[in-house]
């Protein structure tokens, strides 16, 4: 494997499982110094061991702005600068309209939108010309999904953030892109609020039926898209929503 990121500092917000873990592992294998964050100390420790290569794990809740500030204050001291920021933290929750509470709305948007915004804001002093930012979106921002209104709204907002960030930061030489996964084999499927465990297999089969490739994507496939967007090969790409969705929304622009 090549070393496209040799000597680079990479921070993965939400790097303790799924797509974030796969991306962090791939960055480390390509020579980067990697920092991952997450909320669970146990999961973080396990992830850091899997990643290896001196990966640093820091407990930080992206849903709490003060913790985001503390994280980047620490990274300012310990790293000095960041070459790649991958903001992957997010939650999925699906409820019928009539059952959504204000707390549901605030929790989902607090992580998927507010947390993403302030992660980028707090990271900016550590980013400079040539840096890359990737945000994890979702095809839910483009495709109407029953019971998915709150989640989809948060991801549509994130997609807009990505475009605005790209427009605002292009003059500083910082690229910003969004990777939008389709149905992917990650732990978030099993943790999705509102779905009992016995319903997961049927939901998974429905996802496969609705995917033109007739299979779920893998975290490694999405991670490969993330690494491409952060690499020199993508140096002319900014403000783009790259879909890694198995063709689910190929007819939607």
Predicted regions span which residues?
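Active-site loop immediately N-terminal to the catalytic Tyr-X3-Lys motif
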Residues: 97-98, 130, 143-149, 171-172, ...
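Substrate-binding pocket helix/loop in short-chain dehydrogenase/reductase
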Residues: 96-97, 101-107, 207
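Conserved glycine-rich cofactor-binding loop
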Residues: 16-18
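Short C-terminal tail/terminal secondary-structure segment
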Residues: 143, 227, 238-253
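Residue(s) in the substrate-gating loop at a strand-loop-helix junction
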Residues: 138
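Alpha-helical segment proximal to the catalytic Tyr-Lys
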Residues: 125-126, 167-171, 235
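Active-site helix of classical SDR
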Residues: 120, 154, 162
């Amino acid at each position: 494997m090549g070393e496209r990121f040799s000597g680079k500092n990479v921070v993965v917000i939400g790097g303790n499982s799924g797509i974030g873990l796969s991306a962090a592992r791939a960055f480390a294998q390509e020579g980067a110094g990697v920092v991952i964050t997450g909320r669970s100390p146990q999961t973080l420790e396990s992830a850091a061991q899997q990643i290896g290569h001196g990966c640093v794990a820091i407990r930080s809740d992206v849903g709490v702005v003060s913790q985001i500030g503390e994280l980047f204050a620490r990274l300012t001291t310990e790293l000095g600068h960041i070459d790649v920021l991958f903001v992957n933290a997010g939650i999925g929750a699906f409820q019928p309209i009539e059952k959504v509470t204000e707390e549901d709305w605030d929790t989902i948007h607090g992580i998927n939108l507010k947390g993403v915004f302030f992660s980028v804001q707090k990271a900016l002093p550590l980013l400079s010309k040539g840096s890359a930012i990737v945000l994890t979106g979702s095809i839910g921002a483009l495709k109407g999904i029953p019971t998915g209104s709150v989640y989809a709204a948060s991801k549509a907002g994130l997609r807009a953030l990505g475009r605005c960030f790209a427009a605002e930061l292009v003059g500083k030489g910082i690229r910003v892109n969004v990777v939008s996964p389709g149905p992917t084999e990650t732990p978030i499927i099993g943790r999705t609020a509102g779905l009992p465990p016995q319903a997961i297999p049927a939901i998974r089969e429905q996802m496969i039926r609705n995917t033109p490739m007739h299979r779920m994507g893998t975290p490694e496939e999405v991670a490969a898209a993330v690494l491409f967007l952060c690499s020199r090969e993508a140096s002319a790409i900014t403000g783009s929503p790259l879909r890694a969705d198995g063709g689910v929304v190929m007819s939607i622009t």
